[in-house]
Amino acid sequence: MKVAAIQMVSTPDVHANVETARRLVAQAAQAGAELVALPEYFCLMGLADTDKLAIAEPLADADWPATPSTPLQHVLAETAREHGVWLIAGTIPLRVDSALDDHSRVFNSTLVYDPTGRRVARYDKIHLFRFDDGQRRYDEAAVLRAGQQPVALDVPSRDGHTWRVGLGVCYDLRFPELFRQLGQERPLDLIVLPAAFTDTTGQAHWELLLRARAVENLCHVLAPAQGGLHPNGRRTHGHSMVVGPWGKVLAEQATEGEGVVLCEIDQARQTAVRHQLPALQHRVL
């Protein structure tokens, strides 16, 4: 199955970001990608963290997202349908259930659309990033509410295989137990992890962690990322990539800026690796 990781440098202009995302998804589809993943915060990298609150949407109907209050979900569904791809739509801010009486925070949510444009999965980011090096401080919990439920789904590819896909977002990458739990029912074939790693943490840990999660789970990892200097002054690490089950980086965008990272992932190769080193069968704890 050919997969694509989209790299962006999103801005405070939601319309421009969405149009960039649509153009890059179209480029990936034209190159033969069956599954396309957008980066975290693809629709908005605001000047302030609270900018997310202004564009937050309620969760739309899975089959009919075309409502005035859900424009982002509408365009995502239409993009998946137009190009006939599985679209793992980075993250968008979704409103917290009004019953929780929390209007100051939103969920940072990954929505997944099938090639007909139907929403088939939702994952709310569980682990919220906090960073303080004495000079810079960032705390996602100020505007985000943590999700509670790990999410995996089955994605059938055109060659007849069914891929077990586990979802994570950015900081989730640092918590291997999440992906172990996702693989309890059935081993994961692919982890998809939209991200907006800071350049500081990215230089130190991004590739290391992606390769570690691939090796631990003997699966592929698809990691679309924000990559570059944003108008808010934040620099994200980029290096969107695909990692194979042996821990080898199979494809990568090594430069800043927007782009499409394409890779053919091979289930037969993954099966061979698992036979060669059946670590998943050797677990004791």
Residue ranges with predicted function:
Residues 1-4:
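Extreme N-terminal starter segment of soluble prokaryotic enzymes
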Residues 268-285:
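A short C-terminal boundary segment appended to hydrolase-like catalytic domains
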Residues 59, 97-186, 198-208, 274-279:
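Active-site catalytic loop in hydrolytic enzyme cores
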